[in-house]
Amino acid sequence: MRRNITRTLFVITCLATFTVSMVSTTQAQCSNATAVGVYGFTTTGSIIVPSGPVPVVAVGRITFTSAGTVFGSQTRSVGGSTAVERLAGTFSITPNCTGTIIAQVFVSGALVRTSTLATIWVDSGRKARAVFKKTVLPDSTILPTVITTEADRLF
């Protein structure tokens, strides 16, 4: 009887260890579907100009679609000057939950810049973090930036 209990406990322990090790090595897979939804976001950082860094902040709302497009709007302040901007672009997400957003930004219908962001999607796609990799003005001038964004899914 004692031998059967010991053997049963040994088998249960082995199965539990195997199951836990299988679960811990399985990684979540992401895709564009991970991000589909509406997010609220904040952006903070600086634009680097010859006279020194200029602070940038923004809050907004952005929608990610199943077709890999993004659109939304934000209110931003650059050095204390505010504007309401419209965003439109594309996004892609890799299986390791990193990705890219390329967004054109418009004020009163006029293109004011195109930004490329590197992203990471966390908490099963409920949150995202991003850093601006490149910002290009309509005349092809590259604007140096140190800007990050945090987004939370609204629905």
What are these regions (language model features)?
Residues 15-25:
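C-terminal segment of classical bacterial N-terminal signal peptides
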Residues 1-12:
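Bacterial N-terminal signal peptides that target proteins for export
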